[in-house]
């Protein structure tokens, strides 16, 4: 049986979030939470929150045992970009693109 949790429109670059997602893919939930706790990245906080939401979904809606859960799949998709302008010399401006991410975590029992 599988359980999923999704966090959308997170203000972190998908490229940077995928680096942290690769750390927990395939791990037991308890190990993944420990890894994320000591990961000094902004995306680590977002993935930690999404993982805890998936665990709560498993406990409350499916009555699954938390000790047997592992991260079956985790992926980070690209969200919409915020477009901002930075003033430059001689009246010019350059575009700044601020990325956002959608994080999906799927847990399963071993």
Swiss-Prot record:
- List the Gene Ontology MF annotations in alphabetical order: rRNA binding; structural constituent of ribosome
Is this entry keyworded Ribonucleoprotein? yes
Biological process (GO) annotations held by this record are: translation
Q: Which organism is it from?
A: Syntrophobacter fumaroxidans (strain DSM 10017 / MPOB)
Source superkingdom: Bacteria
Oligomeric state and partners? Part of the 50S ribosomal subunit.
Q: Which UniProt keywords apply?
A: Ribonucleoprotein, Ribosomal protein, RNA-binding, rRNA-binding
Matching entries from InterPro entries are given as: Ribosomal_uL22, Ribosomal_uL22_bac/chlpt-type, Ribosomal_uL22_bac/org-type, Ribosomal_uL22_CS, Ribosomal_uL22_sf
**Matches recorded under PANTHER family:** CHLOROPLAST 50S RIBOSOMAL PROTEIN L22-RELATED, LARGE RIBOSOMAL SUBUNIT PROTEIN UL22M
| Protein name in the entry | Large ribosomal subunit protein uL22
Taxonomic lineage from the root: Bacteria, Pseudomonadati, Thermodesulfobacteriota, Syntrophobacteria, Syntrophobacterales
Assigned protein family: Belongs to the universal ribosomal protein uL22 family.
**Among the entry's GO cellular component annotations, what is one?**
cytosolic large ribosomal subunit
Function, as annotated, reads: This protein binds specifically to 23S rRNA; its binding is stimulated by other ribosomal proteins, e.g. L4, L17, and L20. It is important during the early stages of 50S assembly. It makes multiple contacts with different domains of the 23S rRNA in the assembled 50S subunit and ribosome.
The family database entries (PROSITE patterns) matched by this protein are listed as:
RIBOSOMAL_L22
Q: Which Pfam families match?
A: Ribosomal_L22
Q: Show the NCBIfam families listed in the entry.
A: rplV_bact
